[in-house]
Structures are given as structure tokens and as C-alpha cells.
Design a protein with these regions (language model features):
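Active-site-proximal cap/lid insertion segments
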Residues: 1-109, 122-129, 177
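C-terminal cap/loop subdomain of S1 sulfatases and analogous C-terminal strand-loop tails that border
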Residues: 68-74, 113-116, 121-188
Length: 189
């Protein structure tokens, strides 16, 4: 339900909610989404196969990440609109670094801004060349990293209409700043 949410969410839902599409259109949207997902999985498999055939797989770091998620019916919405839900912002950042990665999963707050520092670290270069991100290499070893971020900031800069949003998320709370509307505070405990 969008009751109690910022009005922009209801306005967005007018055009991008499940009720905005017929069942046949939804079937097509869902099929296309999963079709793209399967295609990406297949193409990554092809890359991995070529690396294996060339004998370089054991020397190749592999990263799989996304810039945002997708509703595809979650919250009765479609696309990636002005809602700071985990469906959109809690996205995969998968890393395999040969000879380094030992952990199957980390709950650390990581971001795409960490990718350049990670690549520099793997290459043995100075990670301080990257001002904003941090290397995740030690996280992939399963190590606790001193001073690792306890929160994460996300931004939305409009999609289909101009709207700015900011989100500060910790393990326990999520604050969403909607400069043109009401703000949101969620207790995640």
C-alpha cells in the first residue's frame, strides 16, 4: 500500500503500477525481465568458458554488479521509480578474486564506487588514487575490515519526471529525504 508514503509514489503508480497494465502486458513484462536475466547469465557463462579455454580463468578476477534493481511487480509497481526500496537499491555485487576470495557472502555495505579501488588493489596499485571507494578485497577473504562503512548513501535523480531523493541506510534505520515532499524514516529492527 502507498498509504502514508510521499505523494510522488502514488503519482508514479498512476502510470507504472500493476493496475496500469493488462494481465497480458504484465506477462510480457515479466517474461522480458526474466529473458534479459537469462541472457545476461548465458553471456557471462560464455565469457567464463572462453577464459577457461584460454587457460586464464584461474588468473582472472570476475565482478558481477548492477546499478539498480527492478520492481517487476513488487509493491505492485514496475520499473525503477522514485521509491527507495531494497528491490531497487540492494543489488548484487559479486566478486571472485582467484587466490583471494574465500567467502560466499558478506553483509557489508558495498557500492559501485568500491570497484575502482578493488581493481587497483588486485593490480597492486595505490588504492588512494580513488578518493571515494574502498577495496573489497579483504571482505572477499572474510576478514573484518577496520573502519568499514556502517551506512550507505543512495541517490535518485529522476526517472520519467524530475525528482531528487537521497537515502541514508544503516542496519537499523533508513532515512529517505524527499526535498519536494515528506521525508521517510523506517525502523528496520
Amino acid at each position: 500500500s502507498l498509504i502514508g508514503k510521499p505523494p510522488i509514489q502514488e503519482n508514479y503508480a498512476t502510470y507504472w503500477s500493476t493496475s496500469s497494465f493488462t494481465n497480458e502486458q504484465w506477462k510480457k513484462l515479466i517474461a522480458v525481465y526474466w529473458g534479459y536475466t537469462a541472457m545476461i547469465d548465458f553471456e557471462i557463462g560464455r565469457i567464463m568458458d572462453v577464459a577457461r579455454e584460454l587457460g586464464i580463468l584461474d588468473d582472472t578476477a570476475v565482478f558481477f554488479c548492477a546499478d539498480h534493481g527492478e520492481f517487476t511487480g513488487s509493491h505492485r509497481l514496475n520499473d525503477k521509480g522514485p521509491m527507495m526500496y531494497d528491490d531497487i537499491y540492494n543489488v548484487p555485487f559479486i566478486a571472485h578474486i582467484p587466490g583471494v576470495s574465500t567467502v560466499g557472502r558478506s553483509d557489508a555495505f558495498v557500492s559501485l564506487i568500491d570497484l575502482p579501488a578493488t581493481v587497483l588493489d588486485i593490480a597492486g596499485l595505490d588504492t588512494s588514487l580513488v578518493e571515494d571507494g574502498r577495496s573489497i578485497v579483504d571482505l572477499t577473504r572474510g576478514e573484518d575490515v577496520e573502519g568499514w562503512r556502517e551506512d550507505i548513501v543512495c541517490e535518485f535523480h529522476g526517472h520519467h519526471f524530475p525528482l531528487q531523493q537521497r537515502m541514508l541506510r544503516t542496519r537499523d534505520f533508513k532515512l529517505v529525504i524527499n526535498p519536494e515532499s515528506i521525508n521517510e524514516l523506517y525502523d528496520l529492527r
